[in-house]
């Protein structure tokens, strides 16, 4: 691969059993190479890896690709060996790609290196690709002759013992030759650090990720494949969306999106025109546009007037514009130019189905002549021999799409990136860690109050009373009241009827005490204390919660609260590295958010205190690394636009 791809640098094969390999002089050992070595590619039996790496490091080799498999991915013994190798590499200040990888490719003329065991010759492009799976790499390279995929850099990372997605993300962001960054990942090596790169606005280029392991079974398979820690796919979905990272559903989507960013300008909006010579494919394209949340552009009167002068009377000047099968290449070009000139149009999908009497090749070439600042995507559905001729065009050819639905997804991804790419200010830590070392499991009410005071969390005034000593003098609140039974063992008080609300007298308070005590006894739970609170009649009940994900770190949630929270599942989740826009999205993306706007004559709820609570909660879990989860549920929204956190659980580790 190195030789046939045209690498012009020096190559030193090392193998004690050969004198020459493919015309290159072969050396019996690393030590016998009488030259500096910039890059070492190691493909030796696993038993020889540690020794070979040692020789390379002794020779001051700073970059190593370890292709050999049989490390972390096969179990504990392999994991231990991988760690030993990594330790040596780190101590020497070198970097390692792999192990269990396929190698790397650099297509740019100043390097021109294919250091993989796949002999394909990818064309030079401005897309970088990083894959955790060597088999996916091989599959992608094996399909190059059937696709328009072009690469600048191509990395098979394997187990990511050292070089991982974070390293390459930063490297490619700074590389002016690279325009689009793509990943196939089965795990995130340092997920929280990955997100911080976006939270600090260090990454500006479009990033597209295909994540293997969506289902529980898929996550398990990915873990056994890579030996890496998995995470819930809902968390992956949430964080990628939050930071403007495009998520592909398959390889076709991944590289279609990359082609879009590499070859076309970003759409200014979401209004799309479809031009076709066949009705069916246009309908499929329109369905895909609507599914992706895009709009079918309303063509202006002047545009329709111009189109009527060109299009056959039985064709259509409405969007989608239909030239019928007899539309000639020059006519196709003119129609595309007219529609692109319409101020109501942000992007155009041009679909050409090749009839016997009109050449697809000529139609494509004519449309390629168009100069426009708007994205113009061509779908071509030609006779089979077209693709053979097309692949012989020079490297500057514009990419084509084969399915009428594909451009809709590309436009949707580009519009998503366009909306998310602007600079935003994200939350940072506010305080140093509060000392929670003496706390185990769920925090005590006293410690909860300390946190609440520190972060301005509006917990409703509460009084902790030992069982058996409730009397008129111990209650500082006016009626009505709420009485709760408290125990660290009890997660959901309502499940055992341990909450009594709207208590209007001392007699009702005593009865509530007896009822709660009886409920604890029935359920074999130890009642530690009673909690007395003022009763606030709710207008709405919301939830604000959070947890520390093992991969991506602190997460926060907002949604409908109360005892039916799991049933309604009306929750929006994001990383705790929030921007003000993220907080607005959290509220707006829930059904509760719709209710808070006011429905059926109700007045809208003032959202400023809710936004502040979400922000304070995020800061709390960002600052305090021992907090593993917290749950403010319910948070009562009163009729006079006040909020009260009436039930709190905070767990530490």
Where are these regions (language model features)?
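Catalytic-core regions of core metabolic enzymes
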Residues: 1-653
